[in-house]
Curated annotation (Swiss-Prot):
Organism: Ureaplasma parvum serovar 3 (strain ATCC 700970)
GO molecular function: asparaginyl-tRNA synthase (glutamine-hydrolyzing) activity; ATP binding; glutaminyl-tRNA synthase (glutamine-hydrolyzing) activity
GO biological process terms held by the UniProt record: glutaminyl-tRNAGln biosynthesis via transamidation; translation
Its EC number(s): 6.3.5.-
Major enzyme class: ligase
Coiled coil, from the record: none
PANTHER family: GLUTAMYL-TRNA GLN AMIDOTRANSFERASE SUBUNIT B MITOCHONDRIAL AND PROKARYOTIC PET112-RELATED (PTHR11659), GLUTAMYL-TRNA(GLN) AMIDOTRANSFERASE SUBUNIT B, MITOCHONDRIAL (PTHR11659:SF0)
Protein name (record): Aspartyl/glutamyl-tRNA(Asn/Gln) amidotransferase subunit B
Function: Allows the formation of correctly charged Asn-tRNA(Asn) or Gln-tRNA(Gln) through the transamidation of misacylated Asp-tRNA(Asn) or Glu-tRNA(Gln) in organisms which lack either or both of asparaginyl-tRNA or glutaminyl-tRNA synthetases. The reaction takes place in the presence of glutamine and ATP through an activated phospho-Asp-tRNA(Asn) or phospho-Glu-tRNA(Gln).
Reactions mediated catalytically: L-glutamyl-tRNA(Gln) + L-glutamine + ATP + H2O = L-glutaminyl-tRNA(Gln) + L-glutamate + ADP + phosphate + H(+); L-aspartyl-tRNA(Asn) + L-glutamine + ATP + H2O = L-asparaginyl-tRNA(Asn) + L-glutamate + ADP + phosphate + 2 H(+)
One Pfam family of this chain: GatB_N
Length: 477
């Protein structure tokens, strides 16, 4: 690849997290029974007219602001994109072809060489989704729950140069969508769907190579696989002196290859025209300024805040990649006020526990999170040790019992009375006079030995902090 340069552009469709659809009052949900969240507008019944969902427009403007874009708020208009397919009841899709809601923005990434790189975003525009199509055998099943769901399409310039850069761009975009409450950005639910355009040109050439589009990639890992395969495929053609044809392809995750769909000659003429049933929306500068008083969430600012709390980079990226986990982390840390301890017990231990049970953090109640917070406080106060905390955490999850009750039930109550601990020390020291005589020469080794002895004697029920402080007093007399 030293003699060639890869050119990648990306188009992302993100489903907005609004309560209702884009042009009707039907509800939105990924989990409902098929064809139960529909009305006459979604089915394009005669005589129905679309009404623009105000929240969709607000989210579009808010995303444009978060992506540093110029907004077309003074003239928000819609267009018809014509094509005929089973998933499109009207025979056209309502979109924004001529006046996209946001233009000329960017996302910054740290590239593979640790350099800050700006990826330009050409535009974002609002549009409605189509019905969901499922093929089973020779049958085609359509779920119109998705028809009319509001989407934003995000179109980048061809600034990406590798699969890795593309993944970094998508991960950063996903965080912006999550933390600005635009979308849940769950690729597994179809809330984030990705098309990539890949071409290759000789190093130093100014003209782009022949572009190949790969449609509807359903996971970030598959985006990387699709790009890497397509680079190899095109490079092999070039090295064999064969032409790269302009095509639309899809990614087959069974074979990890891209598969031909159609050529440029088969390209559809969408016959865009203005949507006459929706009057243009004119928003004043003052109106939009008031909207933007709620500042868009900067992912880099969040990174800095988490770093100041002492979290390492991998922990920060885990939290920023999972909105519900970040929310749970903030909730628990507000009670505990120890970010490192909360991260260990909530984001590592507890997440590992619920993953084994195929549950996600969104299903965990505030009541259970409060109990986990109380458990972490007990650990931080050294009233339970690490081994005991792991056992209690699992019991909290399985039984929903309070940690204090579990401590009693499991026999984990600590000995904290100084007089009782002093008696135990005298008993231990009397049996270990030879070790006691070595204290002045090797204090650390002797202290470690005696702490081990009291833990053995009490089956780890002596409070370690109190025990150590009492031991120091005795040894220094």
């Amino acid at each position: 690849m030293q003699n060639f340069e890869v050119i990648i552009g990306i188009e992302v469709h993100t489903a907005l997290n609004t309560k209702t659809k884009m042009f009707s009052n039907a509800a939105t949900s990924h989990k409902s029974i098929p064809n139960t969240l529909i009305n006459e507008i979604d089915l394009a019944l005669p005589g129905t007219l679309p009404t623009v969902n105000q929240e969709v427009v607000h989210k579009g403007l808010f995303l444009a602001n978060a992506l540093h874009m110029r907004t077309n708020h003074q003239f928000i208009a819609f267009d018809r994109k014509h094509y005929y397919y089973l998933d499109l009841p009207k025979g056209y899709q309502i979109t924004q072809n001529y006046f996209p809601i946001g233009q000329n923005g960017y996302i910054q990434i740290i590239d593979e060489y640790n350099n800050l790189k700006r990826i330009r975003i050409k535009q974002i525009h609002l549009e409605e989704d189509t019905a969901k199509q499922t093929n089973i055998g020779n049958q085609i099943y359509l779920d119109y729950n998705r028809a009319g769901w509001p989407l934003i399409e995000i179109v980048s310039e061809a600034d990406l140069r590798s699969a890795q850069e593309t993944v970094l761009f998508l991960e950063e975009l996903r965080k912006i969508l999550l933390f600005n409450d635009i979308s849940d950005a769950k690729m597994e639910d179809g809330s984030l769907r990705v098309d990539v355009n890949v071409s290759i040109r000789p190093q130093g050439a100014k003209k782009f190579g022949t572009k190949v589009e790969i449609k509807n990639i359903n996971s970030i890992s598959n985006v990387a696989k699709a790009i890497d395969y397509e680079i190899r495929r095109q490079l092999n053609l070039i090295l064999l002196n064969q032409n790269v044809e302009q095509q639309t392809r899809r990614f087959d995750d069974n074979t990890n290859t891209t598969v031909f769909m159609r050529s440029k000659n088969d390209a559809i003429n969408y016959r865009y025209i203005r949507e006459a049933n929706i009057a243009p929306i004119h928003l004043s500068d003052d109106y939009v300024k008031k909207m933007f008083l709620t500042k868009s969430c900067s992912i880099n600012d969040l990174r800095q805040q988490l770093a100041q709390k002492g979290l390492v980079s991998s922990a920060i990226e885990q939290l920023l990649s999972d909105g519900p986990l970040f929310k749970a982390f903030k909730y628990v840390d507000k009670i505990v006020n120890n970010p490192l301890s909360v991260y260990k017990w909530l984001c590592l231990e507890f997440i590992g526990l619920i993953n084994k049970n195929t549950q996600n953090i969104e299903e965990i109640t505030p009541e259970l999170l409060q109990k986990i917070a109380r458990m972490i406080l007990l650990f931080d106060q050294t009233l339970i040790n690490g081994k005991q905390t792991k056992i209690i955490l699992e019991k909290i999850y399985l039984t929903n019992k309070d940690p204090q009750i579990l401590i009693k039930e499991l026999g984990f109550e600590q000995i904290t009375n100084e007089n009782e601990i002093t008696k135990l020390w005298h008993q231990i020291l009397a049996k270990n006079q030879e070790m006691l005589l070595q204290y002045n020469e090797r204090p650390d080794r002797v202290e470690k030995f005696f702490m081990g002895e009291i833990m053995k004697l009490t089956k780890a029920q002596a409070n370690p902090t109190i025990s150590f402080n009492v031991l120091k007093k005795i040894l220094q007399k």
